[in-house]
């Protein structure tokens, strides 16, 4: 315990009511957040002579200050605890690394509804189906639905400006409601209803209706229509046959846990309407010495209760681990959902099968993760040996991307002892430089990244500069001129240049901008980690550049042309069937659009060409 913290005096001031406490170190950083039914009793336990674990001993040794927030109820304390954990990310708490909201499939409330992927708040009018474990699962489902039930998936801006059907209609993936006469209102509404039933897990109803329609078409001698519906029936059956379905038809999340070598994996199965929608593995950040029970309890609390990213709650949650606060968690979730949420730890029947599946997936994912981590550790150890460093705990790499000097973006990617640390990847929009001046771009991004206060834990051991001698010289100059409080001499600056034919394995490394560089064997683990972080940085930079370029392209094409306001833009896009059609049009064709003069048509033509 810190010499400056008087635990005895502090405990005299603490109430026995429920609440949340925050522990701070000497630097004023929150290092632990906890909740208690009885604050005085819980906080007193930290200052006994025989502490429960080495982790608690290490925590107490750093306490400089404790703040307490009293709450009305335990439920209130539980919610506040997880909001504080998300806000402060304390190093001694178990932390859920990936807290992105889950994607849903959105069926809009338009006259001709569209299907789309949706994340975040549900403000738009329509229906939401899910959650799905990730964006890939949603995209895969949307692609499947497009083949079976061809309702539109295009943006409203495209749909409202079509004068002729797009390629999706030509290949049978859309009914073409954008163009009058291609599909009746009744037929489109029927396909939308099939989608609604299918996504709600009511496959039997879909099949019953389709079979009835097929028989009617056959009796009316509409054999082509009957054959089309038959194909639809077969497609639905192929999908449903692959899906293990529970007889209960309930919505539930199933959580399996595996723990080994100080790492935990929590695997969540998402089951809606009795069907497995998908699953996802989580690897929470676990401080050394943490008990598995704390990992599970903290994960479940963070997963469902944290702030604005609160998950969509199923009717039941299955766990393969007993929770000490199971009743409190169930009551808190029920209060949030406005309905009864059951938390069950000893299921039977189908539920037991689901739990076994989640447990198996957790164990498999953990083995894979530990194997990957072992490989990363070996590579970083090899790199430290090559660079003559005691160890490499953190690396950062920079790359620049642009098109002919325009829309320049710099990327910074971060690796730690476990590999890519994607939560800390950053992109920087580069401005105020001569177009195409990569040296100036590198100079700017390094000053923005390192010309400020940096926590000691965030100071990299190695900074990799993609681009060779010239870019390395820029980095050296920047660091020589930095006026910062942290140790700017700690990071090793390393330049990397590809060979003449830019093939992997022919990289040359530079410690200094002058003189000869050196190469590593193609099978060197140290080279492999350099290639990995360099490629990550390159991909991250290109991705940012493409987004920026697309944004500029989409907003500037027509909006910057004088004399073309919102109404004329809409008329041009509608008449030409979109921006691409307008780009391909001649001056004479543009001049035929109502409200467009010959002179304005020429201006539009040349603006789009250049």
UniProtKB/Swiss-Prot annotation:
Subcellular localization, as worded in the UniProt entry: Cytoplasm
Domain of life of the organism encoding this protein: Bacteria
GO cellular component: cytoplasm; excinuclease repair complex
Principal location listed in the UniProt entry: cytoplasm
Similarity section: Belongs to the UvrC family.
GO terms under biological process: nucleotide-excision repair; SOS response
Quaternary structure (record): Interacts with UvrB in an incision complex.
Pfam families: GIY-YIG, HHH_5, UVR, UvrC_RNaseH, UvrC_RNaseH_dom
Start and end residues of each UVR domain: 204-239
Function: The UvrABC repair system catalyzes the recognition and processing of DNA lesions. UvrC both incises the 5' and 3' sides of the lesion. The N-terminal half is responsible for the 3' incision and the C-terminal half is responsible for the 5' incision.
Annotated protein name in UniProt: UvrABC system protein C
The entry's keywords: Cytoplasm, DNA damage, DNA excision, DNA repair, Excision nuclease, SOS response
Entry's Gene Ontology molecular function annotations: DNA binding; excinuclease ABC activity
């Amino acid at each position: 315990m810190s010499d400056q913290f008087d635990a005895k005096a502090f405990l005299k001031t603490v109430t026995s009511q429920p609440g949340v406490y925050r522990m701070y170190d000497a630097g004023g950083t929150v290092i632990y957040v906890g909740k208690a039914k009885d604050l005085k009793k819980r906080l007193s336990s930290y200052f006994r002579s025989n502490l429960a674990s080495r982790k608690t001993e290490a925590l107490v040794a750093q306490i400089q200050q404790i703040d307490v927030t009293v709450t009305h109820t335990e439920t209130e304390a539980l919610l506040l605890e997880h909001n504080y954990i998300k806000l402060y990310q304390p190093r001694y708490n178990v932390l859920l690394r990936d807290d992105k909201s889950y994607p849903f499939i959105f069926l809009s409330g338009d006259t001709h509804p569209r299907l789309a992927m949706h994340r975040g708040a549900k403000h738009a009018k329509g229906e939401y189906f899910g959650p799905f474990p990730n964006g890939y699962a949603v995209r895969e489902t949307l692609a499947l639905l497009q083949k079976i039930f061809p309702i539109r998936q295009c943006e409203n801006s495209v749909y409202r400006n079509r004068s002729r059907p797009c390629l999706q209609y030509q290949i049978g993936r859309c009914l073409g409601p954008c163009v009058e006469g291609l599909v009746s209102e009744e037929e489109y509404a029927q396909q939308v209803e099939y989608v609604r039933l299918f996504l709600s897990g009511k496959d039997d109803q879909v099949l019953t209706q389709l079979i009835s329609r097929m028989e009617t078409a056959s009796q009316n001698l509409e054999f082509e229509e009957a054959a089309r519906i038959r194909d639809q029936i077969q497609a639905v059956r192929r999908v449903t046959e692959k899906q293990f379905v529970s007889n209960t038809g309930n919505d539930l999340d199933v959580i399996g846990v595996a723990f080994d070598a100080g790492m935990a994996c929590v695997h969540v199965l998402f089951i809606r309407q009795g069907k497995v929608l998908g699953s996802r593995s989580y690897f929470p950040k676990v401080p050394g010495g943490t008990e598995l029970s704390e990992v599970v309890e903290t994960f479940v609390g963070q997963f469902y209760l944290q702030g604005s990213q609160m998950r969509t709650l199923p009717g039941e949650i299955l766990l393969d681990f007993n929770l000490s606060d199971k009743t409190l968690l169930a009551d808190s979730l029920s209060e949030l959902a406005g309905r009864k949420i059951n938390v069950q730890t000893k299921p039977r029947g189908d539920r037991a099968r689901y739990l076994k599946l989640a447990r198996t997936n957790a164990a498999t994912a953990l083995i894979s993760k530990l194997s990957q981590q072992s490989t990363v550790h070996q590579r970083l150890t090899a790199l430290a040996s090559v660079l003559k460093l005691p160890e490499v705990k953190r690396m950062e790499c920079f790359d620049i991307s642009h098109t002919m000097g325009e829309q320049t973006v710099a990327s910074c990617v971060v690796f730690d002892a476990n590999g890519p640390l994607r939560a800390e990847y950053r992109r920087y929009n580069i401005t105020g430089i001569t177009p195409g001046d990569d040296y100036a771009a590198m100079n700017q991004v390094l000053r923005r990244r390192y010309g400020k206060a940096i926590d000691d834990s965030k100071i990299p051991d190695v900074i990799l500069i993609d681009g060779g001698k010239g870019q390395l010289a820029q980095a050296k100059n920047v660091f020589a001129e930095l006026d910062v409080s942290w140790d700017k001499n700690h990071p090793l600056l390393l330049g990397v240049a590809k060979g003449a034919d830019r093939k992997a394995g022919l990289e040359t490394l530079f410690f200094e901008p002058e003189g000869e560089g050196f190469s590593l064997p193609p099978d060197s683990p140290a080279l492999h980690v350099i290639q990995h972080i360099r490629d990550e940085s390159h991909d991250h930079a290109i991705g940012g550049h493409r987004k920026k370029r697309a944004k500029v392209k989409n907003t500037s094409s027509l909006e910057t042309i004088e004399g073309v306001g919102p109404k004329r833009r809409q008329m041009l896009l509608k008449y030409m069937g979109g921006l691409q059609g307008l780009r391909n049009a001649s001056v004479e064709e543009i001049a035929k659009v109502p409200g467009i003069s010959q002179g304005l048509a020429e201006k539009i033509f040349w603006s789009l060409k250049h």
